[in-house]
Amino acid sequence: MASGVEVLRFQLPGHEAATLRNMNQLRAEERFCDVTIVADSLKFRGHKVILAACSPFLRDQFLLNPSSELQVSLMHSARIVADLLLSCYTGALEFAVRDIVNYLTAASYLQMEHVVEKCRNALSQFIEPKIGLKEDGVSEASLVSSISATKSLLPPARTPKPAPKPPPPPPLPPPLLRPVKLEFPLDEDLELKAEEEDEDEDEDVSDICIVKVESALEVAHRLKPPGGLGGGLGIGGSVGGHLGELAQSSVPPSTVAPPQGVVKACYSLSEDAEGEGLLLIPGGRASVGATSGLVEAAAVAMAARGAGGSLGAGGSRGPLPGGFSGGNPLKNIKCTKCPEVFQGVEKLVFHMRAQHFIFMCPRCGKQFNHSSNLNRHMNVHRGVKSHSCGICGKCFTQKSTLHDHLNLHSGARPYRCSYCDVRFAHKPAIRRHLKEQHGKTTAENVLEASVAEINVLIR
């Protein structure tokens, strides 16, 4: 642009408000309306661009469903939905105080954060009312009647002490946050939890393939961290600390280690995803006592996990099978899954892998019944996110987590509690609900649903 060109700039005051008024007038006359929102008996004709700009939920719905009619399932009256949709055009919302929780929940469902924030601020006035209300001429009876509408939903409000400045409103109590919090959890926070809970739902095919055999000395040298044996196997303070302790208390260097070896195994279901694990088997010798102790410690750790011990984040170790304390690696040990007895923990570990199909994660010590579960678990440690959302572009490690994430875009809640008929968009959410509220498992929930269906058919 030439430097001598003069530019005129006009700011049109009130343009946004005038445009919305004109759009609302066109909506009332049903002109240029390109979508109909259906909720029970309500049929709201409007414009996609206006509704999508005010509600990310509706925006995602329009992207997934390009038709001219959209069904919205809300557990509220059609009047509440109509008021919220109309506020997209008018910028105003008016309702009775007793309905504030219903409007807050419905606005949270539609992801209308500006309405949610206003409802929270208004609700905080009833949680801790200010003393100045009575001094301004508001009678005590009217104040009590205003608070009684929400008394059944709120905890008892504490009496504030007189002060020149009223205290800031407290955060919203848990009972009011629960509907919002349960429906929109963070996907990345649930990813590792969902991976752990879904590990037993894959196919029963075992596809282990041994690709390399190394001696115990080679493996110990490759896995040994710079600071010593305390962080063995890359487990960092949890399993690694226990392996380091066992390695230090192992046989002296002059002692000849028992026959043993280490197999590095590769587990994979596809070319672009694979996992690694360690398997101890008889055969081969290690000439260094510390190396022998490390391998024995890994075997003890695997045996402890097989006996019900925990080598996860808690770092606790369960009792070893057959009362094995780690002092004598050649002591007879009984398998916890069958009546067989073995001399030496390394033979027990080999037996458990060969006969009982137990796979172990070399990063955290978690054990799996199938290599596919280990393969999927290892992707979490690697940070591999090969499943992406086609709507917002967010990536996930697990395919099941992506499916749950898509439920937020579509508004679907496919997971239903058979005990209280509450629905959830995320599988980990219903698992947590069943455990905390009913003390049940997912299998018991499915069984309860089947029993209820049978009862309906019989009647």
Curated annotation (Swiss-Prot):
Gene3D superfamilies: Classic Zinc Finger, Potassium Channel Kv1.1, Chain A. Residues 33-97 form the BTB domain. Its main location: nucleus. It is found in: Nucleus. Transmembrane segments: none annotated. Keywords: DNA-binding, Metal-binding, Nucleus, Phosphoprotein, Repeat, Transcription, Transcription regulation, Zinc, Zinc-finger. The keyword Phosphoprotein applies. Residues 153-179 are annotated as: Disordered. GO terms for biological process: negative regulation of transcription by RNA polymerase II; regulation of cytokine production; regulation of immune system process. GO terms for cellular component: nucleoplasm. A zinc finger (C2H2-type) spans 333-356, 359-381, 387-409, 415-438. Signal peptide: none annotated. The modification Phosphothreonine is found at residue 19. Pfam families: BTB (PF00651), zf-C2H2 (PF00096). Residues 157-177 have a biased composition (Pro residues). May be involved in transcriptional regulation. This is Zinc finger and BTB domain-containing protein 12. It comes from Homo sapiens (Human).
